[in-house]
């Protein structure tokens, strides 16, 4: 490689990196791979990105730097040739409740411009186009009539405050006007006596239709006068016609003056465009429909309205059901089948009761509850049904109603943002504009189309532009940031991405690779931390960090292209890519006669499907992104089972029933990627309850007994042994008022979390801080060496799930989503429980190398051997091929998904031509 075109790192020692030297070619797609914990992120993010960011900040003025703070130099000898660095991580950093997919990708900014520039306003009353008239419009109207036809140009006489009509007519006489018109009758002003109810118009000019320039010029001049005298309005009365043609220079139609489109009119972040009731949030604090009617499959007669239950409140239901049929309301119809008009009747109108002077409806019921909220039971009831429902004024669109009157291609901006991106592409591809509008919108449409295409390329065609950013998964958020980066068209930069393939089906990986190539071809260096085989094979250059994890990793075990791979390497990545190591297909598939059956699943995009989940098997739910996997498994299966076992949870997704062999299960556990603890002091050993044994071990040491230390002195969650200054955190948080809080190492304990006298207690030369700083692998060896088998055995599950590299005392806040999930799996493996439980995993292979996946599958086998059932949402083909039973949803994402494509063994799925999963699985079997 040419040194002048490379990024050169010498002696990198960040975290577990062992003084590594590495060259990264500029302007290439470089994949950094290796086992979990081998040092990939330490190299890519903590060294490369940290230095690129630091140098960029150093290049700014001292004034700008004061707002950015001091950035530490990564621990290495030197780094040369590094461009400005941009990190695109999996974290969902945007917690702003106003941020959406549209605003993040900037598509919405261009839509606002488009609607402000070429949007056409239509009257909601008649549907006619609202526009300002000009004198040229009068000329066009005249030319549409036959030559020689006579007509009059009139100005309506506006009412002047404090001035009578007679006085106004006298002023007209003084100005040189002589006649008014009543109907078609012309009357001299001095001869006219105003009568009540009459509306005369001022005669400006009388002409005959002619195509001559002289007539056109005269009409245009007279039209200017007519508009001025008529306060922006004028009339053309053809003598052969009864009704005059009305023209106005005001933006009005049907007697309503409309607001002219501007960018701010379509901004929900501006008071000019935001809905006045919800202030642009789309939701208000009020009575929540989902809480009032939790089961939408029930009819009103069967008790769909949850607050109309019990002896006293039930009277409302009884009275409603007795009277509503008179208004043709279907009281026996399931709530989800009611029309919007029928729902409005139930909520806002109801059957009218003469003696009360109001209707029986849900709104009236809660008015009664609010009127009685001085009583505790009514306050409790109000709190129970209060949530953040969709704003009834804007129906969740966030904009005021005037914005919805403006349309492009017959569609309002609120309709566009509710379309999936896949439909948005069709809309803009088929958008037909006239020559004038096309010229104005050319650049805007180019930007919109390129960003929409990019969203499709990264597999996000199922998202809508109004989807909130804080509801996206880490993988979705990262790919949206990738789209934003492409849109900004930066060149000569260093992009560092963290597993962009997360949450992506194999079908979409090829398109993601093309997006990465586009970013590279702009002139950027793209460094991707990745485990996906297709992306590794597509790389221009591969850097493998290893050979193992933690203290056994941190070396560069391979660098080069795919063509340079050679057998006999100590790199696990090379071994798997060359087929020297493989994840084997199971010799046989287990079967089961017991199922949990979901019937009529129709939450979100699910199309009323019936699905069976076999017990005591490894069941994988697959399908392209947005096909409905999480909705089926998390929203319906998990929540329904939680309710069945008497646990509180969110309302289960809509379905007809969840039944089957429920008695065969004793519980359900969702092993997700949320942090393992709410406190920054929580860590893997406290979560697995191993720390109790370690604390008791230290309390038994002679010095501890001599000083009177109990197990509590070795806890950083209680006073006694922990540092009094930092309360066992190891850091002090300094509030920076308007800036992010600053964390500084505690000066009292120097980050060791305990008092000096506690740290003097040692077990075979190690104090409690030294033990917490050990990796899981080192700790297992240490405790086995000194006969502490119980502690070593309890730590073993962490090693079994591929977490040998994490430190025992590592704060849960520093663990990735995938690591959190595997710590939870280790906890369940350590419990040795034989109560049959259904475990639900959502993409457990996140952040895992081929070799780690092999270990993970062995952990799954151990759970099944104990009589448990596993349901896994997964895209990874190595896990899918090992499933006993496969449920494939699709065929596409979003509206085109939500159907059961095929269910059965992997071999049966491969035989299904309609299954995308089957096509890619065929290569693995």
PLM feature spans:
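Conserved phosphate-binding elements of NTP-dependent enzyme cores
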Residues: 1-925
């Amino acid at each position: 490689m040419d040194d002048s075109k490379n990024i050169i790192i010498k002696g990198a020692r960040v975290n577990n990196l062992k003084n590594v030297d590495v060259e990264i070619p500029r302007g290439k797609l470089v994949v950094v791979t290796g086992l979990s914990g081998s040092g990939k992120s330490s190299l890519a993010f903590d060294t490369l990105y940290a230095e690129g960011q630091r140098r960029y900040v150093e290049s700014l003025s001292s004034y700008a730097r004061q707002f950015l703070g001091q950035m530490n130099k990564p621990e290495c000898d030197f780094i040369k040739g590094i461009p400005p660095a941009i990190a695109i991580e999996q974290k969902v950093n945007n917690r702003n409740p106003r941020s959406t997919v549209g605003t993040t990708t900037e598509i919405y900014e261009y839509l606002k411009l488009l609607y402000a520039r070429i949007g056409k306003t239509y009257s909601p009353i008649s549907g006619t186009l609202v526009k300002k008239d000009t004198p040229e419009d009068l000329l066009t109207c005249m030319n549409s009539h036959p030559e020689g036809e006579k007509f009059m140009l009139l100005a309506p006489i506006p009412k002047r405050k404090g001035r009578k009509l007679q006085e106004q007519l006298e002023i007209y006489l003084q100005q040189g006007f002589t006649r008014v018109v009543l109907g078609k009758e012309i009357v001299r002003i001095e001869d006219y006596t105003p009568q009540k109810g009459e509306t005369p118009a001022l005669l400006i000019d009388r002409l005959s239709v002619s195509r001559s320039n002289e007539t056109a010029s005269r009409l245009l001049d007279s039209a200017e006068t007519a508009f001025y005298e008529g306060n922006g309005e004028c009339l053309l009365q053809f003598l052969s016609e009864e009704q005059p043609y009305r023209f106005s220079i005001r933006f009005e139609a049907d007697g309503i003056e409309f607001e002219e489109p501007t960018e701010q009119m379509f901004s929900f972040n501006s008071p000019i465009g935001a809905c006045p009731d919800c202030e642009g949030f789309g939701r208000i604090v009020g009575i929540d429909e989902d809480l009032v009617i939790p089961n939408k499959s029930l009819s009103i007669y069967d008790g769909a309205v949850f607050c109309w239950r019990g002896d006293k409140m039930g009277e409302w239901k009884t009275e409603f059901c007795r009277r509503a049929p008179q208004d043709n309301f279907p009281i026996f119809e399931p709530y989800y089948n009611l029309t919007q008009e029928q729902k409005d009747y139930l909520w806002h109108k109801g059957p009218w009761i003469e003696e009360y002077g109001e209707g029986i409806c849900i709104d009236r019921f809660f008015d009664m509850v609010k009127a009685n909220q001085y009583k505790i039971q009514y306050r409790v009831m109000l709190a129970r049904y209060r949530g953040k429902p969709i704003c009834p004024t804007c129906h969740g669109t966030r904009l005021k109603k005037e914005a919805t009157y403006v349309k492009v291609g017959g569609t309002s901006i609120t309709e566009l943002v509710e379309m999936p991106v896949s439909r948005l592409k069709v809309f803009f591809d088929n958008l037909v504009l006239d020559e004038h509008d096309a010229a104005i919108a050319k650049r805007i449409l180019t930007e919109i189309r390129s960003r929409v295409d990019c969203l499709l390329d990264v597999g996000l065609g199922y998202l809508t532009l109004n989807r909130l950013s804080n509801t996206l998964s880490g993988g979705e958020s990262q790919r949206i940031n990738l789209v934003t980066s492409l849109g900004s068209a930066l060149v000569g930069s260093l992009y560092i991405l963290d597993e962009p393939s997360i949450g992506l089906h194999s079908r979409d990986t090829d398109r993601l690779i093309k997006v990465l190539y586009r970013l590279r071809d702009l002139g950027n260096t793209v460094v991707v931390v990745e485990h996906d085989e297709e992306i590794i094979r597509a790389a221009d250059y591969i850097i493998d960090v290893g050979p193992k994890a933690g203290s056994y990793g941190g070396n560069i075990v391979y660098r080069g292209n795919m063509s340079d791979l050679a057998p006999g390497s100590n790199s696990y990545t090379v071994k798997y890519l060359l087929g020297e190591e493989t994840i084997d297909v199971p010799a046989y598939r287990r079967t089961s006669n017991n199922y949990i059956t979901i019937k009529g699943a129709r939450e979100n995009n699910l199309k009323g499907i019936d699905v069976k989940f076999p017990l005591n098997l490894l069941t994988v739910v697959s399908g392209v992104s947005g096909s409905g996997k999480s909705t089926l498994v998390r929203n319906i299966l998990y929540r329904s089972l939680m309710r069945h076992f008497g646990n509180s949870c969110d309302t289960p997704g809509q379905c007809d029933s969840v039944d089957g062999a429920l008695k065969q299960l004793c519980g359900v556990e969702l092993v997700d990627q949320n942090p393992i603890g709410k406190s920054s002091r929580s860590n893997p050993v406290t979560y697995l309850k191993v720390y109790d044994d370690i604390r008791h071990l230290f309390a038994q040491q002679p010095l501890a007994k001599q000083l009177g230390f109990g197990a509590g002195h070795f806890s950083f969650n209680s006073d006694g042994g922990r540092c009094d200054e930092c309360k066992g955190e190891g850091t002090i948080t300094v509030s920076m008022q308007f800036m992010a809080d600053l964390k500084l190492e505690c000066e009292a304990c120097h980050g060791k979390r305990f008092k000096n006298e506690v740290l003097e207690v040692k077990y075979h030369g190690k104090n409690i801080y030294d033990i917490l700083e050990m990796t899981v692998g080192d700790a297992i060896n240490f405790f086995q060496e000194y006969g502490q088998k119980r502690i070593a055995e309890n730590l073993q599950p962490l090693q079994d799930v591929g977490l040998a590299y994490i430190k025992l005392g590592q704060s849960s806040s520093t663990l990735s989503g995938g690591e959190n999930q595997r710590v939870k799996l280790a906890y369940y493996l350590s419990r040795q429980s034989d109560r049959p439980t259904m475990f639900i995993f959502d993409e457990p292979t996140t952040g895992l190398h081929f070799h780690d996946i092999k270990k993970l599958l062995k952990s799954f086998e151990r759970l099944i051997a104990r009589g448990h059932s596993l349901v896994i949402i997964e895209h990874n083909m190595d896990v899918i091929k090992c499933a006993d039973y496969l449920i494939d949803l699709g065929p596409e994402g979003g509206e085109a998904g939500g159907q059961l494509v095929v269910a059965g063994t992997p071999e049966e799925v491969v035989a299904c031509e309609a299954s995308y999963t089957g096509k890619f699985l065929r290569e693995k079997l």
